[in-house]
């Protein structure tokens, strides 16, 4: 029936029968077309036709299911056009409506509805929406915590103290997250208990023989392979260079050591050899004929190897068996208590759902699983009778996007497919055993495998939803490509989407960077995409562009700091990258007549000019970047739309409406009340609000308004308000002097608010919100503003949310506000309403995840210099589906907390899995492009970064795995791969790179690397910002004819705030700010602050990036905070403490170099060190906040007006300790000292406030105050 010319591989995927078939379909390989054609061939097979309702087709989304149904329907209809009398076709068209083409959740729901009686669930159950689920979970966990507090449950209290930092909401977050995580396991309770039992080790526990030890060793071997390459490269240089052959022996010994480690299979031997190895010293020979450049190069490479081996040694030292065993034993009670707490929460949550006849989204899969599974006498999980009936029913089970399956879904599909075997637990893990199982009835004809699975593991990007790409990979590695096997795989890697230039570039890049370690698959020639699309010869393809820009300012750090540029830099960098992209788009589009890019239009069958709709800008995440890009593109006149999933609650119209709802629920909230009063809903001016506040500064703003309202209306004040009125005559005078218009305004607002509060009780929340839209006129007002259609759409979404909420079992304004707040501060924030259609001629900005499955003529991948998000690794308890819990070790009695050894292992595992996911996300992004691909990114210090890339080019075929593992951005992967490409030669020359590259790769891919000048883009930005506002105003006024408008504009522009001086006083100051203020007061003019500043060299001219003085101070302060003086008898003790901080990742090895063990020892042995050692009460890094009169800092203010104005001073005291007759205050300084008196004067005011803070907090006298100066290894006393 099909006229399509299928490739041989596609034909195999369509026609292969009687086996489990895994189809690995690369990007653009036409997998959906193949899947649809396979179904059509099945139902129209002349020998063995299968009715379409006998096929189970599982898709990833409802849209995919609908598209598949439509394609099949079109194919059947086309067949009927050719053969109108065909009974087979007519039957299949009829059956299509009841076909089982659906998402996994739709199938599970069908199973539940058909078999509800087997799981004791009410047949009238409904699925609770996200709104109700959030509220029920919060209610359940609040009740559970209250109950456990009430009975003083010891395990629970210990958990709170250990992992909640005295705020049980943090423990609630841990429980909710772990609950969600456990639900991705087929049997959550079993998983939770097994993971806790992993800590229950016996006396015979030997860490060196555990899975943990093997993981550590395997991870380290990846690094060792990199070291081996570096040493082998060095030996090659030694043998091919003049006069440095005496280096050969020590390098050969090092290489033998690395090779020996790589052969080790025993962790004990591996650990012992690394700890014992002593690097041989390099001979100190001088040879005039020696190749100095080669000599220096191999020394640097060896130093890098030595440094990393020392770091591994430090790590391995911590994995001592007895210490590790004690950790496991100590953590077991807490982890068991945590698992039990999650189970208790789940039971309470389940009870609440059952009370309301509800199930949630997670329940759908788990209830289906419980219907389809049974246990045999051996405890193995086997198909239930119901599952066996499904096996009889379905002739074939076809699964789309198989790489995104999770373990629950895999078990479900195995129950309804004809697979031999059973599931069982082994070492806490659920695994499938492909063995014969004994069933009561023989399953005649059901022994023929019937699973069809299609997907691309390189596009598995949903691990955050607990997708498990290993499910696909295990089959991919096990299945054979040979015909006739029961488990077979077919590879579809011919790409029918992209130009050859895009394909070749993607292949080159991923051959260089993707591996089993990072990406979970070796990207070999066999895995590479093959060109399948034809674009003719009329228009030649273009190279892939990489546009780079150095984000460092070429001015001194001091000047940046003075002007707060460091705070604005991040935003400016996004703006500048957005501007760069705008320039590229303008060039691509041209004037739409000539000069622009030509793209092939498949519908027209010819080339045409590029349009804005043909371009997509992809980003890893759009929340912060997209709005800035939209603004930059709009400035250049480029129509643009950003498809974001956040920012909804930050829009002005939604913030205003939520504030209004908050004050209707409770008007005693100043911030939302002022937000409403300043909005068009109430239209109060700043002056009016100040006049209201003058009634009483010690009560809420609403209470001030209520007092005015009651006194103006001659109503008697009740005792509550009377209590707050110290002088009634004074209040009466304020109200009497108040503008009559303002008093009426207040009364009108109070009366409206009371009416709204009353109305909110009697109608549903959705009706009430729409009533407010109309009553206040705010809906119409929002529509009249710029982007009014968008604003009104956002307000309609709030109304729809309220409508959903009204259908739940929760009622009332208070609960609705709580629900909205929960959404706002969780991942439930939404993007603004979508008001653009798919065919609008605009550039689209979207996340890479949103782009999956789509394609565009031009793709611009931006933000490649942005760091990967590794924030989850900082949580105090980590979760891994296979390895279990990775908690901090917290001993509340000894007040000790640090990452446990098992946490460090899990942390590294999650980090590698996250990097693998990022690798696949990058692959998805680059394979969306049909004709043109552009990559943009910012680099911190271009010259140094590119030099680092060059140092990683020892292997022309692969970027070293250790380098890929340490990557923090996409550019950290792309850069080292491209710098050795033949097309990067001119780029290196532009940067005046002197390093010679012996491994230039002559690959057929085409690249164009551009270095953009940030200064030029910044200059344009500054020039725009410097357009005189007054000129714009003048021009506007010239165009106004009606004098009334002129007068109003002049009046508004000449407005002067009554308390202008007060507005410049911050509410909080740090002690450092106070110090700066006093320095400013002492200067005659500000020129003194600038005249000594010198512009430092730009970073690309510096040989090596140095740690700044401020960073150095921070590092030394951090070490002093953790210094244990009792274990600091010599320099070796101090070095050991430094290494411990490196090991615990408080500082890096590079940062540790600024800590002088000699200087620290001098402090320890000095008078102050001895006094600290003798004290029984030593406190370090103590934060404080104290209130002081503003006049104490801002002496220029009017003393009468500002006598009651207060400031909060904040700071952190480095160290204080107690002696018999009082406290001793100590502050560390790392400044360079020229003049002792100058230092004393500089810090005198700072120490004064530290002293005052200590006096107030402790109530004890500070008898001595010292500055310890590390630059001179001495202290000075402050009087």
Curated annotation (Swiss-Prot):
List, alphabetically, the InterPro entries matched. Answer: AddA, DNA_helicase_UvrD-like_C, DNA_helicase_UvrD/REP, P-loop_NTPase, PDDEXK-like_dom_sf, PDDEXK_AddAB-type, Restrct_endonuc-II-like, UvrD-like_ATP-bd
- Catalytically driven reaction(s): Couples ATP hydrolysis with the unwinding of duplex DNA by translocating in the 3'-5' direction; ATP + H2O = ADP + phosphate + H(+)
Which Pfam families does its entry note? PDDEXK_1, UvrD-helicase, UvrD_C
| Entry EC number(s) | 3.1.-.-, 5.6.2.4
Signal peptide boundaries: none
Q: Where does ATP bind?
A: 25-32
Where would I find the UvrD-like helicase C-terminal domain in this sequence? 526-853
Q: Name one GO molecular function term.
A: ATP hydrolysis activity
Cite the entry's keywords alphabetically.
ATP-binding, DNA damage, DNA repair, DNA-binding, Exonuclease, Helicase, Hydrolase, Isomerase, Nuclease, Nucleotide-binding
Q: What region holds the UvrD-like helicase ATP-binding domain?
A: 4-499
Tell me which Gene Ontology terms the entry assigns under biological process.
double-strand break repair via homologous recombination
What Gene3D superfamilies does the record tag this protein with? 3.90.320.10, P-loop containing nucleotide triphosphate hydrolases
Alphabetical GO CC annotations of the entry are: cytosol; DNA helicase complex
Q: Which cofactor does the UniProt annotation name?
A: Mg(2+)
Give the similarity note: Belongs to the helicase family. AddA subfamily.
Q: How does it assemble?
A: Heterodimer of AddA and AddB/RexB.
What is this protein's function per UniProt? The heterodimer acts as both an ATP-dependent DNA helicase and an ATP-dependent, dual-direction single-stranded exonuclease. Recognizes the chi site generating a DNA molecule suitable for the initiation of homologous recombination. The AddA nuclease domain is required for chi fragment generation; this subunit has the helicase and 3' -> 5' nuclease activities.
Q: What is this protein called?
A: ATP-dependent helicase/nuclease subunit A
Per the UniProt record, the source organism is Clostridium botulinum (strain Kyoto / Type A2)
